[in-house]
Amino acid sequence: MTHQPQQSPQFFLTAPSPCPYLEGQMERKVFTHLVGDKANEINDLLTQGGFRRSQNIAYRPACELCRACISVRILAGEFKMTRNMRRVWTQNNDLIGRVHKAQPSTEQYALFRDYLDARHRSGGMSDMTVLDYAMMIEDTHVNTQIIEYRKRGPESFISAKGDGELIAVALTDVMADGLSMVYSFFSPHMHDRSLGTYMILDHIQRAHAAGLPHVYLGYWVEGSRKMQYKIRFTPQEHLGPRGWQRFEG
């Protein structure tokens, strides 16, 4: 008898651990490996079903007593900037975001390290080495890319390249129905630029220009201050028991 390779993903459940978003809660996750020639297709389906990707793992919360994590995606074609978002967009019009293959660099890691040390010193990623960072970027079988944001240089209008220092980076999956922002980081010394907001706005513009309807932001947790920024980008949809439901804020 000829052995047939496993095509359907196998799912596993993590042990309980402290929730990083809600104090006093415990979290569990269901996860599967994204490998093989079906990795892109499976990643698309799972992301549309509320999963997130980390390296070659797709996961989603499977907590026993809590359902606070809600998957969020922006409706790129209907999105309208608020006055404050227009200010952020204009303030950063000296930046150029350039798409690269998902390959790490020492310059990226230096910015990543600076970001973690300033913003997430006690977080779960705080002790990541340069090798850990390289794995985060490269260890994938799906269609993903790096977007580097730099200041415009004297020849930027000719070359379409930013010539200045690297000030922000996004790791982004390109899916059949949208862009999924896997992880992003930026210079912690440029608070006035609101670079996190700017990168989301840039992804919305990129998705709309490519004819992709959605930008996936991951999970929103009501009551978690670090997650509140996600519901400012409307209209958006939240994934619930009845599927994706429109949310206007």
Curated annotation (Swiss-Prot):
Q: Which cysteines are joined by disulfide bonds?
A: none
Which reaction(s) does its UniProt entry say it catalyses? N-terminal L-glutamyl-[protein] + L-leucyl-tRNA(Leu) = N-terminal L-leucyl-L-glutamyl-[protein] + tRNA(Leu) + H(+); N-terminal L-aspartyl-[protein] + L-leucyl-tRNA(Leu) = N-terminal L-leucyl-L-aspartyl-[protein] + tRNA(Leu) + H(+)
| One of the record's GO cellular component terms | cytoplasm
What UniProt keywords apply to this chain's record, in alphabetical order?
Acyltransferase, Cytoplasm, Transferase
EC number(s)? 2.3.2.29
Taxonomic source organism: Brucella anthropi (strain ATCC 49188 / DSM 6882 / CCUG 24695 / JCM 21032 / LMG 3331 / NBRC 15819 / NCTC 12168 / Alc 37)
Q: Does the keyword Cytoplasm apply?
A: yes
The superkingdom listed in its UniProt entry is Bacteria
Where in or outside the cell is it found?
Cytoplasm
Q: Which Pfam families match?
A: ATE_C, ATE_N
Q: What's this chain's function?
A: Functions in the N-end rule pathway of protein degradation where it conjugates Leu from its aminoacyl-tRNA to the N-termini of proteins containing an N-terminal aspartate or glutamate.
Please report which protein family the annotation says this sequence is part of.
Belongs to the R-transferase family. Bpt subfamily.
Which InterPro entries does the UniProt record give?
Acyl_CoA_acyltransferase, Asp_Glu_LeuTrfase, N-end_Aminoacyl_Trfase, N-end_Aminoacyl_Trfase_C, N-end_Aminoacyl_Trfase_N
Q: What is this protein called?
A: Aspartate/glutamate leucyltransferase
Q: Which GO terms describe its biological process?
A: ubiquitin-dependent protein catabolic process via the N-end rule pathway
Name the gene behind this protein: bpt
- Where primarily located? cytoplasm
**Which top EC class is named for this enzyme in its record?**
transferase
- From the Swiss-Prot or TrEMBL record, what is one GO molecular function term? arginyl-tRNA--protein transferase activity
